[in-house]
Amino acid sequence: MQAYGTNAQALTSLAGLSFPAAAAATRPLSLLNGWQSSQFAYGTGDPAYTVAGGVVYLSGSMYQPSGSSSEFAVLPPAARPRHKLWIETYTYNGAVGALEITPSGVMDAFNNTGNAAQGYTSLAAISYPVNS
């Protein structure tokens, strides 16, 4: 793990950071509606999920070069929440975006300022309890 910036040595918070502690099977997300992996441009990994210890971990990043649907994937039953989740995430140019994950597994990416979510949406460091 690395921390960057001139103040990183003074304070680097790890609050909210989580990842699977043991090796667990990572599964690719099948992207829909023109959404594509941003791995080639940013080296962030292809969009994927891992279920370990009752927690779902998302990873990778994506963008949507064409199309207008915010729906980008559908999770399998073993990785779905019990209730609708809204989770903040990083989108293009530092804009704050959100993921909506429904009990049926539908995953959507949004942001309030134009089409930043379509330009880039990160799934890194997003996790939630299974059946949450």
Residue ranges and their predicted role:
Residues 56, 76-77:
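Short low-polarity hydrophobic stretches
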Residues 1-31, 40-45, 64-74, 81-132:
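Extracellular jelly-roll beta-sandwich "head" domains, especially the C-terminal globular C1q domain
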